[in-house]
Amino acid sequence: MATWNSRGLRGSFLEELVNMTNDKYRSQKLAPITPVRMDKEHRQITLAYFDQRSTIDYIGAVQGIPVCFDAKECATDRFPLANVHEHQIRFMKEFEEQDGIAFLLIYFKAKDTFMYLPYAKLDEFWRRMEEGGAKHFKYEELDPAYEISTYSGTFVHYLEQIQMDLEQRDSR
């Protein structure tokens, strides 16, 4: 039986689909995106791995534009902001300040829907939470134009949403 790490097959449904999508993008020379992995074999030897938390799930470039993103799953139509950590928000903010594009890919299981959440909207939800507001956001609060559909065998085809994100930035 195939195993991953030491506890059976691990990894989320969304991450598996994103990995397959990224492999397709790489083979088509559209976007070299790679998962950010921790060296689990040596972490008990090198204490430094415990000193700094992991940042995000994926980093790379889409036709020369630096991108970083995290893949998240949500069982209901309410996404808890506790699923995103402060150090991830900070990393994404710094990445955006260097003219990169940061975002979340979210799979809403209850709706069987994939969504692209631009960093600017994530930051808006995060600030609302910090100011005492809701510690989650609802699916209905997201722009339906950022829904991701399957395209030509690509499971989580998010390149169109990156393009839309770029166009909205240019219009500001």
Model-identified regions with their sequence ranges:
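Acidic-basic catalytic patches of nuclease active cores, encompassing PD-(D/E)XK
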Residues: M1-Y49
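Short, electropositive alpha-helical surface patch
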Residues: P118-K138
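Conserved catalytic cores of phosphodiester-cleaving nucleases, focusing on short active-site segments
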Residues: Y58-T76
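Mg2+/Mn2+-dependent nuclease catalytic core
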Residues: C74-Q98
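Electrostatic, structured charged patches in enzyme active sites and in nucleic-acid/phosphate-binding
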Residues: R26, D112, E130
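Nucleic-acid nuclease catalytic cores
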Residues: K93-D123
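Charged phosphate-binding loop/patch that engages nucleotide di/tri-phosphates or the phosphate backbone
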Residues: E140-R172
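Short connector loops at helix/strand junctions that flank enzyme active sites
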Residues: D51-T55, V62-P66, E97-D99
